[in-house]
């Protein structure tokens, strides 16, 4: 028999009345009713009410009264039925209580810095410093149990489809592509460093070259990048997947049902879109102003550049003639809104970098108003209504700028309008694939990879040799859910000549590619199958399912937005002897010192 417990704290019911039991757990609540003391004893599984009567054992009663909340105790007692008026139907044990005759304190708790039942109401820094208390809160614990269940379902889904689970190395070589690496100095090889992997990219491609047909892992990834609400600094986990002899559609046909089934299982009363529509990157930027569209928002942006090119509204007409664009953002049922509504949108647009924000209102009595309307003919107004999908009672806002900037600005205005007008569909998960990403982009006047340098360009070597680099699209794809990117993937470039050509266009010689990615280029010389993969983010998926405001709420021991572990005190200084052993010396710049001190 276990000396600490005969039952768990969720197990007792009326069938146990009269039994002698042993329970262990934390003191969750105490209620002192004069000569009777009630204690809610909590373990991982549930809560059982304990009762102590001063008239039965005054010494035990006084001792129990003195013990602090969250102390760990072991009790022995007799199960008794509660009186009818004290039954608690919200507890599985709510029909019984345990009359305690023995109580041992296993570990006494100090005065609590946070109130466990409502720990999520405390400042985040305090919660993270005392995360071991925060994790005892039911709401926080339920997020972690959801995380465990989601990962378990991911494993089952992949194994049922014939994928094998692999663990790739944590200590590897630094890569020049992507985010900043976390470096680990080598003691044995002075002056050299390992890197923590940003993703298992190279290793999973090498597994395909090794003949492992279908692979997955719940992969830890490490990137030295700033935090966002949907991104934790330091590390994150992804369901990393790779397959041999597949096309883009093959990857979609595997991953789409996996994600749909997982979301359906854990969505509760929320709906899940039955299909994942395909939206090209180009269309996403035009229609939604972002490559991460929230399809719960029904507003669709339209291009109305041609209308204004032929109009008398010189500000827009001359801009379009110089190569700028005009985007229209509908605002349904707002034509009768006060002037302050429109002025606030203009001010918002200016704050995010727009030179201004034009608008037209189409009243239900067919009156057309707004600072732009008087410059347009009836035909032009009708064309705008058709292109923007607006009618009587609606309004439409206009952004004019270079195409990329106009997309960014109109996307932000679309998001604001969707929220303020309460247009965002509630209690649903809306997915889409974003496809046909540009292969290249210009950064600081130089050609660079826009997404994944190891993806296959559509059109292969011919496209790289004969097309405008900015017109080349790749077999790259994202999955977006409710405006959050939850996965990226690609069909990989498995042909060495195409790889060398692609890298040469961004300034790498074949020798430089071999030096940086030698393991991969060596493998490409010995027979590599066509292959592709995808990597849904575990943390973001759980964050969406848990419906929490930031990703730290679903990570057991997260870093702060400044990349600090307040519980463990990391990052921390190390002593000089350790640095000497690693052949390292510190040279902290004034700029870095300022960041540290702040």
Swiss-Prot record:
GO terms for molecular function: aspartate-tRNA ligase activity; aspartate-tRNA(Asn) ligase activity; ATP binding; nucleic acid binding. PROSITE patterns: AA_TRNA_LIGASE_II. The record marks 33 as: Important for tRNA non-discrimination. Residues 201-204 are annotated as: Aspartate. It is found in: Cytoplasm. Homodimer. Belongs to the class-II aminoacyl-tRNA synthetase family. Type 1 subfamily. This is Aspartate--tRNA(Asp/Asn) ligase. It comes from Anaplasma phagocytophilum (strain HZ).
